[in-house]
Amino acid sequence: FNTLFSSLNNLGVKVLESIALVLELPKNFFEEKVIRGNSTLRLLHYPPIESDSNVLRARAHADINLITLLVGAEEGGLEVQNKDDEWIPIKPNSKSIVCNIGDMMQLITEGNLKSTPHRVVEYSANDSKSRYSMPFFLHPSPDVVLKSVYNEDDKGVLAHDFLEERVKAIKLY
């Protein structure tokens, strides 16, 4: 577990380096912010569905963190919402990793990078199988101030407070 977690964290830092360069920030802009982050690795199991087709296995939502790395699933069902509000299926590939932008990244980029709404559906109960997903949620350290990368006067919000507010809003506690 520790090796996998460390590898995904290192990959996440590399993705953040690329994002920083696209945003015309120093390459290591995010590194200090995530070095002691609250990142989480989860294993999700979606059991087979026995009812009608088009069942939602996970309702539409966006992730709270900076970025999420979704380690390749072998079963389909993941869909992302595009800017026209259409749901686009992501073709499963066990050798790929999908990267979603989270709400914290959307906040600090003032919406220039949009948080990715996504859901998990079951297309056909006749062929339903268990689906496993392994998301790595890359979070900054709780004491990091999330503020605009474009506006130096932005007071921002503590990552801990932002996370707590969102978790309460979606009734996770």
Where are these regions (language model features)?
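C-terminal flanking tails of non-heme Fe-dependent oxygenases
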Residues: 1-173
